[in-house]
């Protein structure tokens, strides 16, 4: 019998085991589509970013003008720029839904995969932050000033650290050039970690909505899940296309149409929408160092989730009380996102503080306790 090159060639064999003959649980739902959508987002961002980098100039006197030049004079430059800007938003929508699915279905119990995923989230946030500075508009400049200044809260080394990142005594040309270098470099680091994420996932196999061992009920990845993923690709492309062509500035900030001016502070300094929940947590603590630590722990909290899992069941599928807590967390995060975009005044300060306490309580106290209670209820005869 003739051997199949797909199964024998050293390189094709790896691709075959990852994308063609990979045994996958038969019951994984559309919530498992977001991994492949994130890979598509990454590919789109790297391609559009590469073409933008060909025309962008990382200099404070030319950066803003070079972005205008891209939009006005470069063939389809406006389209490439809008895809890149809105693609970032879509990237975060997909990663937040991907994380939410992991929390709901207990995927965090695959510890190595989960931990690399959290590192990937940090890298994505860093990439988006330095990228937001590059157009050198008002919100780019002041957003960078506020966020980098937070590092000065660290005792003893804070001020030195801030000046080291700035490359001087204020945000200037050195800052912009290094941020451009980081923005170009970090996506390649994301690719490397994504491959590690895959590697560890394929060591254990995917989780499924029931949270049970699915070894006795596996189906090949191709054609079943390749077609399912392609449907996801089309849906996402349609959504991104509609956003880019009809509402390209919906998720941006109007302040960024004004060139950066160190002498004029915008009335409300705020980051992009996907950072607002963490920004609200930062602002809800009156102490600077406390706020910075709360900001860090709002994301680092995800690393603790596997150790706070007290339930005998893996997923939330058959746990109505924990389901209620999960959707409370989702609603709470949406409230934090809304608060992060509001001015620092009452009642927003108070709502933000309540939402921040609720956010940490749900992770650290309420969910583990309710899971323990559910175990007790299940053990009653």
Swiss-Prot record:
Keyword Ligase: no
Pfam families in UniProt: Cytochrom_B_C, Cytochrome_B
Gene3D superfamilies: Cytochrome Bc1 Complex, Chain C (1.20.810.10)
GO molecular function: metal ion binding; ubiquinol-cytochrome-c reductase activity
Membrane topology, record value: Multi-pass membrane protein
UniProt-listed InterPro entries: Cyt_b/b6_C (IPR005798), Cyt_b/b6_C_sf (IPR036150), Cyt_b/b6_N (IPR005797), Cytb/b6-like_sf (IPR027387), Cytochrome_b (IPR030689), Cytochrome_b_C_euk/bac (IPR048260), Cytochrome_b_N_euk/bac (IPR048259), Di-haem_cyt_TM (IPR016174)
Cofactors (names): heme b
Residues annotated as transmembrane: 34-54, 78-99, 114-134, 179-199, 227-247, 289-309, 321-341, 348-368
Residues bound to a ubiquinone: 202
GO BP: any one term: mitochondrial electron transport, ubiquinol to cytochrome c
Main location group: mitochondrion
Record key words, sorted: Electron transport, Heme, Iron, Membrane, Metal-binding, Mitochondrion, Mitochondrion inner membrane, Respiratory chain, Transmembrane, Transmembrane helix, Transport, Ubiquinone
Annotated binding of heme b b566, by residue: 98, 197
GO cellular component terms listed in the entry, alphabetical order: mitochondrial inner membrane; respiratory chain complex III
Subcellular location: Mitochondrion inner membrane
Record's cofactor remark: Binds 2 heme b groups non-covalently.
Residues binding heme b b562: 84, 183
Record family assignment: Belongs to the cytochrome b family.
Function statement: Component of the ubiquinol-cytochrome c reductase complex (complex III or cytochrome b-c1 complex) that is part of the mitochondrial respiratory chain. The b-c1 complex mediates electron transfer from ubiquinol to cytochrome c. Contributes to the generation of a proton gradient across the mitochondrial membrane that is then used for ATP synthesis.
Other facts noted in the record for this chain: Heme 1 (or BL or b562) is low-potential and absorbs at about 562 nm, and heme 2 (or BH or b566) is high-potential and absorbs at about 566 nm.
Subunit composition and interactions: The cytochrome bc1 complex contains 3 respiratory subunits (MT-CYB, CYC1 and UQCRFS1), 2 core proteins (UQCRC1 and UQCRC2) and probably 6 low-molecular weight proteins.
Protein name: Cytochrome b
């Amino acid at each position: 019998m003739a051997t199949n090159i797909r199964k024998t060639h050293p390189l094709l064999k790896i691709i075959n085991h990852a994308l063609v003959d990979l045994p996958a649980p038969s019951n994984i739902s559309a919530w498992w589509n977001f991994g492949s959508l994130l890979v598509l987002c990454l590919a789109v961002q790297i391609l559009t970013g590469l073409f933008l980098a060909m025309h962008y100039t990382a200099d404070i006197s030319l950066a803003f003008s070079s972005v205008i030049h891209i939009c006005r004079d470069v063939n389809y430059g406006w389209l490439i720029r809008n895809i890149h800007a809105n693609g970032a938003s879509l990237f975060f929508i997909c990663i937040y839904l991907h994380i939410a699915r992991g929390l709901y279905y207990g995927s965090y119990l695959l510890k190595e995969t989960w931990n690399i995923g959290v590192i990937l989230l940090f890298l994505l946030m860093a990439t988006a932050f330095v990228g937001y500075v590059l157009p050198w508009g008002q919100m780019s400049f002041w957003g960078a000033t506020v966020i980098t200044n937070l590092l000065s809260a660290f005792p003893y080394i804070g001020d030195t650290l801030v000046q080291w990142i700035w490359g001087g005594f204020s945000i200037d040309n050195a800052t912009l050039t290094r941020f451009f270098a980081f923005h170009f470099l970090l996506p390649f680091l994301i690719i490397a970690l994504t491959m590690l994420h895959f590697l560890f996932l394929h060591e254990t196999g995917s989780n499924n909505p029931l949270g049970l061992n699915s070894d006795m009920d596996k189906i090949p990845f191709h054609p079943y899940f390749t077609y399912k993923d392609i449907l996801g690709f089309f849906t996402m492309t349609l959504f991104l296309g509609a956003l880019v062509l009809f509402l390209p500035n919906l998720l941006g900030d109007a302040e960024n149409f004004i060139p950066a001016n160190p002498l004029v502070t915008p009335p409300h300094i705020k980051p992009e929408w996907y950072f607002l929940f963490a920004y609200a947590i930062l602002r809800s603590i009156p102490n600077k160092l406390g706020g910075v630590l709360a900001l860090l722990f709002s994301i680092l909290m995800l690393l603790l989730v596997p150790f706070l899992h007290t339930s005998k069941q893996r997923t939330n599928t058959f746990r109505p009380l924990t389901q209620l807590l999960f959707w409370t967390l989702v609603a709470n995060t949406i409230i934090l996102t809304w608060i992060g975009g509001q001015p620092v005044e009452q009642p927003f300060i108070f709502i933000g503080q309540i939402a921040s306490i609720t956010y940490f309580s749900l992770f650290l106290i309420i969910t583990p306790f309710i899971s323990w209670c559910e175990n007790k209820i299940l053990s009653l005869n």
